[in-house]
């Protein structure tokens, strides 16, 4: 088995080195099993600084980014100014200096003070660490495996509602997080995609700013967050919590071509007497069950209330043990 970091990934050498060394310390040497696409773009130290500068400039209108430099890196990628992993093998110093100079000019125009001396030194050291891995044309490798009939499991990041095209724009990430992103992020044909598993929580969460029609601001929302340990994986920020939004879920099923749904974290709702599910939005007094062009604070969620199952689902060993109320909840969602 091998692992491949595809062309659609934005690779931060610093974070990569930290994770790889952590794995090595636990007895998992990945240098022989992990390949990296030459076409993956590199997150530069100045990308992180730009991320912070842009957020600071937005003031109260900030999006709430992770601060990892994702947006600025995608900006360079789309404007054809990016630095890629494969550039490590060809004129890297020249390409890096050109990108850095452009970033510094932008930062001067924003009057943003910064010092990347230490970060840059660590970043350059991490680049040397990166070179020990096999840098490949990943699209050829992956497609050859598919031709040989081997199984390929693709893993993306983030949910449908953070997709740059179909999410709650502008409070989204900078890439396509839907199923189709697998094709462009790995270089495989849509014909090679088999089953599409849609994984969702039994409730809704969101990190950072942006619209959230079913968000709960009371003790129920706090309880869901505490029981679900809802904190951002990257930033550690407390996630906003709310009831399940079936308007958004149906939209995600449609956009991704989901063939099977998988619900997780149902045990978080074990202790609730009743559970709500949003089945429609009320916009300007009119109900709709179609996800709209834009979501704002004026949207009212229309709920159906269902009885809770009041059972510890972590003790369940088979579907036959599911309580009647839980099965009713599943049937309603279906």
Named regions from a protein language model:
Residues 1-334:
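Non-transmembrane, aqueous-exposed alpha-helical and coiled segments at domain scale
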């Amino acid at each position: 088995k091998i692992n491949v970091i595809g062309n659609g990934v934005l690779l931060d050498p610093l974070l990569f080195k930290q994770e790889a060394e952590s794995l090595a310390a636990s007895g998992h040497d990945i240098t022989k099993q992990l390949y990296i696409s030459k076409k993956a773009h590199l997150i530069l130290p100045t990308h992180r600084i730009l991320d912070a500068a842009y957020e600071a400039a937005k003031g109260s209108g900030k999006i709430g980014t992770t601060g990892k430099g994702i947006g600025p890196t995608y900006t360079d990628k789309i404007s054809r100014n990016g630095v890629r992993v494969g550039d490590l093998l060809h004129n890297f110093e020249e390409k890096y200096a050109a990108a850095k100079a452009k970033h510094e000019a932008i930062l001067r125009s924003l009057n943003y003070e910064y010092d990347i001396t230490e970060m840059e030194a660590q970043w350059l050291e991490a680049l040397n660490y990166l070179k020990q891995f096999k840098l490949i044309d990943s699209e050829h490798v992956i497609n050859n495996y598919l031709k040989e009939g081997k199984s390929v499991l693709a893993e993306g990041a983030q949910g449908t509602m953070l997709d740059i095209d179909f999410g709650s724009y502008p409070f989204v990430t900078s890439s396509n997080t839907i199923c189709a992103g697998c094709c462009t992020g790995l270089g495989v044909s849509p014909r090679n995609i088999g089953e599409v598993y849609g994984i969702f929580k039994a409730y809704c969460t969101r990190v950072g700013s942006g619209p959230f029609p079913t968000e709960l601001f009371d003790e129920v929302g706090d309880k869901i967050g505490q029981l679900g340990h809802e904190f951002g994986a990257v930033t550690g920020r407390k996630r906003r919590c709310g009831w399940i939004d079936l308007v958004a879920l149906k939209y995600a099923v449609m956009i991704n071509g989901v063939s099977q749904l998988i619900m997780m974290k149902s045990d978080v709702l074990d202790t609730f007497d009743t559970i709500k599910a949003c089945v429609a939005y009320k916009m300007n007094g009119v109900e709709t069950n179609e996800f709209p062009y834009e979501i704002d604070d004026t949207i009212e969620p229309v709920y159906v209330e269902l009885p809770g199952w009041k059972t510890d689902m972590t003790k369940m060993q088979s579907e036959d043990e599911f309580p009647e109320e839980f099965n009713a909840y599943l049937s309603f969602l279906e």
